[in-house]
Amino acid sequence: MRIITALILALCLGSGFVNADDIKRRRDGDKVEMVKLPAGAVQLFVEMDRIDSHHNIKRTFHTAQKHPANPVIGAVKPWEDRRSTWGSVIYDDKERVFKAWYGGQSGQKKEYMPGHLADCSVLCYATSTDGIHWERPNLGMHKVFGTKENNVVISDDHHNGLAHWESIALDPLETKPERRYKALGWSSFDWNGPMSGIYSMTSPDGLHWTHTPEPVFRYHPRSGKNDLGPVGDAQSLMIDTLRRRYLAFLRILPDRAFSSSNDFVTWTRPVASLKARAGEAGNTIYNHMGFVYGDRYLGQLTYLHQKDPAKTLVDIWLISSNDGEQWNRPETGRPLIEVGDIGEWDRFNVRHTGSPPIRVGDKLYFYYRNTANRHSPYVGKDNTQIGGGIGLATLRVDGFASVAAGYDGGQVTTKPFRFEGRNLHVNAVANSGRLTVEVLDESGKPLPGFSRESCLVMKADSVNHLVRWQNDVQLEKFKDRPIRLRFHLENVRLYSYTIH
């Protein structure tokens, strides 16, 4: 038994990849549950748990590139607060328009807690046909700064403090027109009281909103509603189209939690979802959000760097999940969206919006928000209150992480899986290299007609390249049996693969 285990270990080491759990299962004779890939479910390299081995491969996580027109939504009106501390941007396929909601202030002040006056917040609305150039419709709904000629949707001095909205979503699961839009909003007008916390809201058009009469998650620590403690003011909403449910991600220091609902009315008690690592300060994991990607989940984590009060910054990192509930923090080595450099508008404090990325052509649009100032506990003088707004950063479709090899060649081999669909497509940069794919049986032997030599070489830069073999054979013939894929890369960067 020891000799067999050692042989398996040697073979895995020779391939350049070792999965200790797989070795233990093989040694103990355990059966590993085989994945069945739905048709069209893109497979990324953010996690490597569906990869069996790789050789001479480098994996890289990629940072989104900021648009030169940033901020695409800046503070140009008196009520558009320079600190856009929350926001959401969606694309309405039916109306073929981008829609944005973002924070501002009404010019009024209110006592949030005894002896503490603060600006009353507003929620602003804008639209765009290209996601870059935005218009502010004159809604005439609320009087702020002495006028109703504005784009204000919600004013918290008229809505029980409900203008602090982290996420607004257009719900593809909803059948009732009056509930097409959904949101979670924070109110703190009853500070430390039973009415302070997170409310759920619905709307037919994203402009006229109805909220629950009391919080669905309370701030007050003695409310008895939250097992893990009082919720904070950094929440987000995910519509889980894979499992047809709603997930609320909540701030319960020092960790993050989730709660689920099937009807957006009744919610489960919060359960820990994303835990702080050893040595991290209690406020470090500031916020997170999630979205469906393929047959799995990705998300963004707003991370507060506060160990050194003289260098306090906030940036955005990639996270991932298999079930939407428990989240992983891949060792990416770099943020998904970085803070800006000296001279740039977003130097100190970038945070994700409450919305998933939007595909536009061959790119993903990530909208992020920048509050002009540094977050506490910053103690230095390099700070400002000038700037802020909503920015745009773009990433290649599926371009979160890639595997690559030089001209000396490398290989990536998947674990066995079943699938639905007919054809294999890849997202890769191979215009100065060679990419070929062979199809193997469960034991690792090439299947007739699908060898490396039979594969037509890819020499292109494409986000959706159809992999073909001689005689135009299709993968469909193997849909009832387990297969593996082996990718051969020569000066190639591979981002994803999908069976359609």
Protein language model regions, located:
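Positively charged n-region of N-terminal signal peptides that target proteins for export
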Residues: 1-4
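Bacterial N-terminal signal peptides
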Residues: 6-16
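Carbohydrate-active catalytic/glycan-binding domains of CAZyme proteins
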Residues: 21-500
